[in-house]
Amino acid sequence: RRIKEELGLLIGVQTPPHRDLKRYDHLKEIGVNRVSFCFEIFNRELFEEICPGKHAEYGLDFYLEAIRYCAALTGTGRSDEPWVTNGEIIAGLEPPGSSIRAIDWITSVGAIPTVCVFRPLVGTDLQDHEPPKTEDMIPVFKHLYESCMEKGLPIGLAPNIHVSLVMLPEECRGFSQKRYL
């Protein structure tokens, strides 16, 4: 909290789900503003295949339970402290329709999706996996923006976040023909 007060920063934490979900209440109490869970893949079979460590240690259901729990903390506690929950997926590791279903689930519980774009890296298990085609990603990005807007989720609150592989909902505005107030 002292760092926040002195520097005026928002504090975010990316974490695997903890077995004691009440720990997230504590993170909020000490001034954390954003908690993010990178479960990568919404398709259960692909999650088990591509994320064997996450599958063995936590399982997809526990990631989703943690996201749901943390999203429900929005609106509790200090009103002057923003609290946002993110569910992070990696588009291009599963069919676009599965990524869109992930976005729908994440926004349905009041969390904000973060969509990373898969890029194969030399020396990794997925180095030979083809990167997604741009035309396959456009509907995912369009849906990311529209789903957040239709659910009235707070996007664009954290200034100066620029990550080359991540599309934030507000950055996807240009893919949509819909205009929101």
Task: Identify the meaning behind each predicted range.
Residues 75-82, 96, 100-181:
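Auxiliary Fe-S-binding modules of radical SAM enzymes
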Residues 1, 24, 63-71, 99-104, ...:
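Generic structural signal for well-ordered alpha-helices
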Residues 10, 14, 18-19, 53, ...:
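Conserved strand-turn element in the central/C-terminal portion of the radical SAM core barrel
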